[in-house]
């Protein structure tokens, strides 16, 4: 407990930053515009980043912000036309977007400055592909010893927007910046009501993607801070650097530092939940918590999480958002995998002097399986095969050149193998590869008005085989099982590529 309070005091001593004056600097908005153009994530919305940057309009915006009545009228009249320019909708939209993008950069500055206080020995290599959603690999590779139950947690929605501002007060004591944050939240949503659905919550993401990431990241960091604090005390972590791979779906940066709670509330419950075998991971607005103990202890955890949300966020989390499942019978959809936890027997031969004996040890570990039915259904909707998995031609692509057809089929196959490289059983992937290969051949044969056999004899199956198995070198982590006969490409080999930033479209067509 003393260590936790010491960390809290250190965080509080680094929070005196005043960044509000930067909003009156022209270079800030140019930087925000360039950041949007260089963003490596797919463009999901139409924002000011898709418009031509105008330094003249930025100067006009800064001049208007210097006016005393600018912010007063904005608060009293939160309509978009009255906010910035009621005569010209383009000016109004441009001002709103560029100002919110600039403000997003401003509020991130205190967090960036605080990273300079981190000890050098704890620095993590800055690989460009550490943003991968497969940063959950450390959880999937954990050995679950003496664990019987999993807690599936849905991170609570809705939240009141004022809670977001209050959470940032721990890190940003620049009062004008906090007031401006309230202004943006008031402008982008209905301030006097709760956000009652995920669709409404992501309205803020549609308006300003970067600001949404920052606010959501801060909120979730506070939500899981106490869990990560307990997890760091564990002596059973599989990787020393696993703390650096905290899962962040579609976030531009990973954050190691978390907000501070009331130590008095923590002291009363910390003793009951000190567990050196805690396993925690978050993905797609959900989280999984696994630790040793009985069903009674898991129910205690469930009600503790409910009370924690009510105490820390002034928000009542419905108990039905936390599901308790027995580990042996747990099978769930996990980032495009069907994950289960089978008990694998392991025979170990021990020998003492002249006597030898066998020890039967059962290891508990996540088994990641490719969902064959789901993927075949997705290929069927995309008109690559029938509902039963029989390959068919794709007539809409027959107007393309032969190279474009091969390239499209090849990219789909590569993406499937690349994304599901962490699967422990890859036979389903080879079945999907067969479907795509034959569908490609049927499409080319239909284009040239010949049979598949004739076309394959003329083109050669070797070229197709090499084309579909070509793989670009990327940074990856491999966790292989100990076998007497090992070769690359084994069905039991699990490779976690660290350049995957979103879910494959065939796995989750909605994302």
UniProtKB/Swiss-Prot annotation:
The keyword tRNA processing applies. Belongs to the intron maturase 2 family. MatK subfamily. The gene is matK. GO terms for cellular component: chloroplast. InterPro entries: Domain_X (IPR024937), Maturase_MatK (IPR002866), Maturase_MatK_N (IPR024942). The keyword Secreted does not apply. It comes from the Eukaryota. GO terms for biological process: mRNA processing; RNA splicing; tRNA processing. This is Maturase K. One of its GO terms (molecular function) is RNA binding. Keywords: Chloroplast, mRNA processing, Plastid, RNA-binding, tRNA processing. Disulfide bonds: none annotated. Usually encoded in the trnK tRNA gene intron. Probably assists in splicing its own and other chloroplast group II introns. It is found in: Plastid, Chloroplast. Pfam families: Intron_maturas2, MatK_N.
